[in-house]
Amino acid sequence: MENQKENLFSEPHKRGLMKSPLHPSSKANMVLAEIQPDLGPLTTPTKPKEVSQGEPWTPTANLKMLISAVSPEIRSRDQKRGLSDNRSALPEARDCLHEHLSGDEFEKSQPSRKEKSLGLLCHKFLARYPKYPNPAVNNDICLDEVAEELNVERRRIYDIVNVLESLHMVSRLAKNRYTWHGRHNLTKTLGTLKSVGEENKYAEQIMMIKRKEYEQEFDFIKSCGIEDHVIKSHTGQNGHSDMCFVELPGVEFRAASVNSRKDKSLRVMSQKFVMLFLVSTPQIVSLEIAAKILIGEDHVEDLDKSKYKTKIRRLYDIANVLSSLDLIKKVHVTEERGRKPAFKWTGPEISPNNSGSSPIMPLPASLEAEQSAKENCAKNLFSTRGKPSFTRHPSLIKLVKSIENDRRKISSAPSSPVKSNKAESSQNSPPVPNKMAQLAAICKMQLEEQSSEPRKKVKVNLARSGHYKPLAPLDPTVNTELELLTPSLIQPLGVVPLIPSPLSSAVPVILPQAPSGPSYAIYLQPAQAQMLTPPPGLSPTVCPTQPSNATGSKDPTDAPAEKTATDAATTGSLQPAPERHGAKHRSKETTGDRGTKRMITAEDSGPSSVKKPKEDLKALENVPTPTPLFPSGYLIPLTQCSSLGPDSVLSNTENSGTPSPNHRIYGSPIAGVIPVASSELTAVNFPPFHVTPLKLMVSPTSMAAVPVGNSPALNSGHPAPAQNPSSAIVNFTLQHLGLISPGVQMSASPGPGAGTVPVSPRVEADNLSSRQRRATNHDSPVLGQSQLNGQPVAGTGAQQPVPVTPKGSQLVAENFFRTPGGPTKPTSSPYTDFDGANKTSFGTLFVPQRKLEVSTEDIH
């Protein structure tokens, strides 16, 4: 039992869940009865009684409580001032009346709308003052006193005073104080308003609105927009789009609030409304037409339907005041769409001549155009008689605001011009090009002019000297010097054209400023060269010979097709003319399909070589060869200095040391192109302080004869070679200049040679009828030195072919080297690659369909 007591006491919230025993003892019931009164929270709470049934809790209950608490203090304060007797009794009486009476009874006890109407209020107001007051008596009006006497709000009195002020029946003295003038100036004012209305062409606007109403039916909003457009067109012509308040002479408004826009709106509208009655032929105006005309005072696009209705209500207020003055009366006009309320003019008949003096109003458009805006505002603001007061016209306020807005826009505008301004300026003015574009265009024009001048002068000199005629006999022992057309070699930068002797080309060379620097390679464009054709009876051949002192190893920097002579000359001249042209065309097509093109020049080896017979030279003399012209060229700097120039004009020495005459022939790989003797291609002696080492690199389709520069500055090389350029740079440069096709890749891997010694081919001493040769490869490299204008040049021995004229192997050589579609007597010229392996290129007509694999054993 004790445990049960503890459970019941400790967990009272579980009593409801506990089941009563089947046979509860009476003692347990007594214990529960004793515990029950002590457990107050366990009992069910009773519902609290409502404090106030008649006053429910509302969101403003606290506010009402505060007002009721503060109101005694307010009443005591009013009692101290002596005003609480009259004013406190009225709210108390109203409160008591409102408490005792219901809503309808309270409304009935208040003054009715008719009693509070503006017309009735205006009648009461006019009854207080005479129509024609005595000017000698004080006729001041205090609006506070009038509102208190008439028991109305002061704003209702303001509406009446504004309409009376528009007719100059009252004038404002100070705040809430006016002067009563009565009807003394009424006739004069009405005459003035009629003249102003005629100037504004209100009669025409009324007729136009009526005619459009008959033509089509539209609602208020659309008609507002259309009629505002008409009003703007008419008022824009007369300059009265925003007419100011029409004043009379002698009537002054000394307060600034008179000219404020907000207070002036009702007065100006009242004057315009009166004008409509005075100018209309049947002096009946409906409020709808009046609203359409008078609504042009404000911005019509900003007005919606509610504002339009507000204008109508304001017109009703004006009409009520004018009706109280017995100037108009309300009538109903019957139209097609029904009866409409309108007002008829019942005032005095006014003619424009009745006005004794001219009113002060906005000037006509002719005078307004002549005078400034400030003078116009001053005329509208001040009267001619009396002392002008310092009041601010609303137009001045607009002017100040516009100036402030402009200043704010200017100060906040970014420094950079706006895009729209740029577009407008670009349309009005011609576009200004960029400075870099101007410089590029100027440089391009100057280069074109400088490159075109040498061509013109070369053609003139060639025409004068008669180079297009058959050539004179060639002297193999005399080297004619190249002419320099312009003596501007001393200029730091310029294009110096090299005028050749009859069988060379004019190559413009750009001279750099620095006396020493990286070597340059001259590239000639292949498409502009003219080919030299031999006579049909002559078929010269070129066979490279092996030099003894100088070798033709390739420099890795000379990877992009360095050459001064061709592989060999073909016997295409024996073919007919169409076949020769076809061979030329095929050779041009197949040259771009190869991998890396290299043309090796063979140096004359000395007296061991076979000399050219005099018959061949004589036959060569009579060849009419037009001079090929290369109008443009490129200079590409190379990182490794070489001594290319002088060795093309060196007198080569053998072991015997006897100099050999400079009988060099620069051939072309195209069939039918005649070789040119090197005696006509001599060196140009450049000043050593102006020219850096040059590498002359000519494409095979344009190579006929190349002059080589010769200078002491070209002979000496750098003690240590510079870093070789990468193959990507070389390929990009050559492809950008258009010298190689995009598919051709030039290798720039370093090679064994430190310098390049071009080797010129020699004329093979053989008869024309028995031209037989066999190209053999010489495997043993020869190391030696050659004197280049007094400077020793070390050369790495390369494998050069040794010309052999076998007596009985003509058929084998012809069958071996014959190519399908090639020439009848093809020639071969091996060239040396960077790795030292020999490769053989056969003739100029390369057919990619057949690949010839030749081993050195077959050739030997």
Curated annotation (Swiss-Prot):
Tissue expr:
Highly expressed in liver, skin, thymus and testis. Expressed in trophoblast giant cells throughout placenta development (at protein level).
Database matches in SUPFAM superfamilies: Winged helix' DNA-binding domain
InterPro entries tied to this protein: E2F, E2F_WHTH_DNA-bd_dom, WH-like_DNA-bd_sf, WH_DNA-bd_sf
Organism superkingdom: Eukaryota
Q: Which GO terms describe its biological process?
A: cell cycle comprising mitosis without cytokinesis; chorionic trophoblast cell differentiation; fibroblast proliferation; hepatocyte differentiation; negative regulation of cytokinesis; negative regulation of transcription by RNA polymerase II; placenta development; positive regulation of DNA endoreduplication
> What positions are modified (Phosphoserine)?
71, 102, 412, 416
A cellular component term (GO) from this record? nucleolus
Q: Where in the cell is it found?
A: Nucleus
Give the molecular function GO annotations: DNA binding; DNA-binding transcription factor activity; DNA-binding transcription repressor activity; DNA-binding transcription repressor activity, RNA polymerase II-specific; identical protein binding; RNA polymerase II cis-regulatory region sequence-specific DNA binding
Function field: Atypical E2F transcription factor that participates in various processes such as angiogenesis and polyploidization of specialized cells. Mainly acts as a transcription repressor that binds DNA independently of DP proteins and specifically recognizes the E2 recognition site 5'-TTTC[CG]CGC-3'. Directly represses transcription of classical E2F transcription factors such as E2F1: component of a feedback loop in S phase by repressing the expression of E2F1, thereby preventing p53/TP53-dependent apoptosis.
The annotated subunit structure for this chain is: Interacts with HIF1A. Homodimer and heterodimer: mainly forms homodimers and, to a lesser extent, heterodimers with E2F8. Dimerization is important for DNA-binding.
Family, per the entry? Belongs to the E2F/DP family.
Q: What is this protein called?
A: Transcription factor E2F8
- What gene is this protein translated from? E2f8
